[in-house]
Each structure stands twice: as structure tokens, then as C-alpha cells.
Amino acid sequence: MKTVFFTGFPGFLGSELLPRILKRSPEATALCLVQPKFAPLARERARPLGDRVRIVEGDIAAPLDVPIGDVSEVFHLAAIYDLSVSRERGMKINVEGTRHVLDFAERCRSLQRFHYVSTCYVSGRYEGVFREDDLDVGQRFNNFYEETKFLAEVEVRNRTGLPATIYRPSVVVGDSTTGATQKFDGPYYVIQWILRQPRVAVLPVVGRPRRYRFNVVPRDFIIDAIDHLSARSDSLRKCYQLADPDPLTVDETLEVIARASHRRVIRIPLSRSVAKFAIDHVPGVYRLLRIPAGAVDYFVHPTLYDTANTQLDLPLRVPRFADYAARLVEFAAAHPEISASAMA
């Protein structure tokens, strides 16, 4: 009986992906490394899977002391998903943590596959088309989250003896069918700002919104994609950018959100630098907008993501943002208690 080793459960993606992996392999069991503070939630979410899931308390920040057994497949999703993370913490979790999982995988004698969830934003602020085989192209990074995820992917690629596959999601939002999510970030900052306003809403807009694109994919697409691609033998040693190949411009994205929110939006243009300075240094601005300065960078993002491998190997298409945005808005309006923080 094969064992799947899994990090990132019961997180935003892991909670949905683990049951899918086990459904695909009825004979498999899962060994989930979970931080002690999340262990009760992990056990609750694993309950429908019965004795097929074993929760082991631990942390990727330290060398892994867990039984290797007959682990044949590793899914590494755990990371710090925080644009404001310090470099020290990002290095400890995203880079050293990935190194510890890689070390564990190399000790697994039955290992057949290693699946690593990276991010499109290892591109940093690269100008132009960033391809699935690109990594170090001399890019500058917006923040330590991007930099440490980049360095973590370098670690994975440097382990040339491991049978690895890399998945790079773009900005992930809630389920395209239900709108459900565990965190409000990315476009949700705009959704929440607009929902707090009257029918005619004022929205600060940075840069040139008709030039830049905002790449959004729903969680269910990411889960479907990883589930399918991880089962393919020919996905071995490939990288897949799980992104919209034809994303809306920022301006189009804002208009879709406005319509879904039943608002008419008056745009107030601001430069990127002025917007970030005001949020960080002008008293009351952050409390009013509730948009972190680091999020501003993604509304003037200069990178386009090539998805050639994904389009070739995945018989699924990314749902169009305009087709499900109303569900995201409805869920956000009904759940004001959800925050922007994501589970590591």
C-alpha cells in the first residue's frame, strides 16, 4: 500500500487537494505533517477520510522527524503566503522548510514523484513574457514572499535526482461555483472596499489600468489541474504555470467587480509610489482603505505568463473571471469575518 506524504493540510489548497488525491488512489493512505496549532482542525477535516489519513504534528521549519515507511509520493504545499513576511521568516519557512522536505523525500526509497506548489510570482517584476522553464532571469522582487518562493523553487530544481513536478498558480481566489474561500486578499481588497461604499463608489486606481493585466484563477481550477497533472507520467520534471492565458486588464477586472457589486465606480488615478507611501505613512489611509501597500504592486504587474505546458497537458480551461465574479462578491458580503491571512 503506497503512502502519500503531504504538507499544507488543512490549508486553503490542501484541504481540497488531499481528498482528491486519495479518491484517485483508493489503495493509498496519507501522512500529513501539520503544525500543532492546526492539528485539531486537520483532524476534523480529515475525519471523512477515516483511517486513510494520519496526522503527524511537526513543522517544516525544522528537519523532519517523521516515519518514512513506504512513502511513494510527496506533495509539498506548506509555505508562508504573506506579502509582508520578513526575509528571516520567509527564509526559514519557504526556503529552509522546502529544503527539509526535499531532504525527507531523498530518504524515501520508494519515492516515485515529488510535487511542489510554487507561484507564478517567482517572476518578480520581470518585464514581458515569463515562460514555464524560466526562473532566474535577473528579476527584481516586490517583496520577500516572492524572493523566498523563488529561492525555494531553486532548491527544488537543484535536486536533479528527484522526480519533481512544479506547479505555479497565479492569484488564487475562491471556488468558481460557490465563491467559497478561506482568505480575502488580492482582488478581495477591491471587492471589500467597493462593498463598503454606496451605489456610486470612489476607487483609487494606480498606474495605467488598461495596460496591465490581473491574472486570477479560482481554487477549483487549481485543484482540478494539480489532481490531473500529478497523475500523468509525462508531467515528470515539468513546470506548469496555472494561470489564465488571456487575463483581463486591471481596468476590465475592476469593471467586472463593480458590476457584480451593483456599483458604479468613479476612478481616482494615483501613481504606484504615491499610493504605497500614503498607505504606509499618512495617518488614517490604511484604516480607510484596508489595502496593504504590498498589494498595490500587483495592480501594476508587468509580467505575462506563458502557459504552454499547461495548455498542452491539461484538458481543462480556466474559468473566465466575469463568469464567476458575482459568486465571489456574494460570498465576501456574507462572510465579513474572514481575514486576509492564509494558513502556512
What are these regions (language model features)?
Residues 25-28, 305-344:
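Amphipathic terminal alpha-helices
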Residues 88, 92, 96-144, 165:
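Conserved Rossmann-fold NAD(P)-dependent oxidoreductase catalytic core, especially the SDR/UDP-sugar
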Residues 57-96, 106-108:
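NAD(P)H-binding glycine-rich loop region in Rossmannoid oxidoreductase-like domains
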Residues 2-25:
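N-terminal Rossmann NAD(P)H-binding glycine-rich loop of SDR-like oxidoreductase domains
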